[in-house]
From Swiss-Prot:
GO terms of molecular function: tRNA (guanine(37)-N1)-methyltransferase activity
Species name: Clostridium botulinum (strain Alaska E43 / Type E3)
Gene3D superfamilies hit by this protein: 3.40.1280.10, tRNA(m1g37)methyltransferase, domain 2
Protein name according to UniProt: tRNA (guanine-N(1)-)-methyltransferase
EC number: 2.1.1.228
Compartments, as annotated in UniProt: Cytoplasm
Residues the entry annotates as binding S-adenosyl-L-methionine: 110, 129-134
Subunit structure of this chain's protein: Homodimer.
CDD domains: TrmD-like
Family, as annotated: Belongs to the RNA methyltransferase TrmD family.
Keywords recorded for this protein, A-Z: Cytoplasm, Methyltransferase, S-adenosyl-L-methionine, Transferase, tRNA processing
PANTHER family per UniProt: TRNA (GUANINE-N(1)-)-METHYLTRANSFERASE
GO cellular component, one term: cytosol
Reaction(s) this enzyme catalyzes, per UniProt: guanosine(37) in tRNA + S-adenosyl-L-methionine = N(1)-methylguanosine(37) in tRNA + S-adenosyl-L-homocysteine + H(+)
Length: 238
């Protein structure tokens, strides 16, 4: 997969040069391209924003630099243009999985008070992280892109690594433990030391179900309980 990122602050995406995503780039599993919107402005002072028509606080990103940067990206990337903005659908794991199946993607990061409305006809999809305000689209783009890239086969080293993680099936992940066995008076659950893989699997499943029901009832209501789940929870099969 190739991802092109259109931004006013390219240096913010240097985080992808490290750790798992950095290794995936080195191994040619994925390709990231960062384009500076400011490089494509026709303004001699490299200005990319202006005052809003009709008045109001703040500045609005002008259409010309953005649209020309989109066109520049599309010379080598025919993927969907995804804009990080408050009008979009709330991003979730299912959306990450769907987007990970795309061959290429282009991410547009807004800034200031937003983008000129005339840019929207060049956008295929708008996503939001939630009902809160960030200082720029870059802050939202980083977790969205990371959640997509880690689903690409080979990025995590083994494809099954993400299958048991939180949200993969609307369940929070079970508790994890490592050495030492005892820490500040709290010990690792004995079942995890038993070596009985089937019992461990059932214990982990029960922990995930209980955690999700208690912490994220909004997710739990979407969970379809199996007969085994109901038995683990001590509920009657219905």
């Amino acid at each position: 997969m190739k991802i092109s990122i259109l931004t006013l602050f390219p240096e913010m995406f240097s985080i992808f040069n490290h750790s798992i995503i950095g290794r995936a780039q080195e191994n040619k599993i994925i390709e990231l391209e960062v384009l500076n919107i400011r490089d494509n402005t026709l303004d001699k002072h490299k200005k990319v924003d202006d005052y809003p028509y009709g008045g109001g606080a703040g500045m609005v990103m002008a259409p010309q630099p953005i649209v020309d940067t989109i066109r520049k990206a599309k010379e080598n990337n025919k993927g969907k243009v995804v804009f990080l903005g408050p009008r979009g659908k709330t991003f979730n794991q299912k959306m990450a999985m769907d987007l990970s199946k795309e061959e290429n993607l282009i991410f547009l990061c807004g800034h200031y008070e937003g983008i000129d409305q005339r840019v929207y006809k060049h956008i295929d999809m708008e996503v939001s992280l939630g009902d809160f305000i960030l200082t720029g689209g870059e802050m939202a783009a980083i977790p969205v892109i990371d959640s997509i890239l880690r689903l690409i086969p080979g990025v995590l080293g083994k494809e099954e690594s993400f299958m048991d993680e939180s949200f993969s099936e609307d369940l929070l992940e079970y508790p994890q433990y490592t050495r030492p066995y005892e820490f500040e008076g709290e010990c690792v659950p004995e079942i995890l030391l038993s070596g009985h893989h089937e019992n461990i699997r059932k214990w982990r499943r029960l922990q995930s179900l209980n955690l999700t029901e208690n912490r994220r009832p909004d997710l739990y209501k979407n969970v379809i309980l199996t007969k085994e789940d109901k038995k683990l929870l001590g509920r009657k099969n219905k």
